[in-house]
Structure formats: structure tokens, C-alpha cells
């Protein structure tokens, strides 16, 4: 699981650490993923680490 409690953040770094979301979309890093989780009102979850 990914802890998104300190998100959303206004700016994400370009750090490459891909995660695959339950929407079958690859997120570049935890920050991008967590911002999307917050935007989805918690409906988006982690499928697995790495690219989809």
C-alpha cells in the first residue's frame, strides 16, 4: 500500500519510481499517484509497483 495522507502536493518532482494504479495507468512516482488518489476521492488504488 501507499500512504497518501500528506497529499495532495502542489508540485511533484520528476523522480522516476513508477506505480500502476487500479485504473491501469502508470504514474511516474508516488506524488503523482497520490495526487490522483486524492482527486479520485479514494476510488483509485495501487495495483502494483512498477509500470502497468
Curated annotation (Swiss-Prot):
InterPro entries: Kazal-type_SerProtInhib, Kazal_dom, Kazal_dom_sf. Residues 2-52 form the Kazal-like domain. It is found in: Secreted. GO terms for molecular function: serine-type endopeptidase inhibitor activity. CDD domains: KAZAL_FS. It comes from the Eukaryota. The keyword Secreted applies. Keywords: Disulfide bond, Glycoprotein, Protease inhibitor, Repeat, Secreted, Serine protease inhibitor. PANTHER family: SERINE PROTEASE INHIBITOR KAZAL-TYPE 7, SERINE PROTEASE INHIBITOR KAZAL-TYPE 7 SPINK7. This is Ovomucoid.
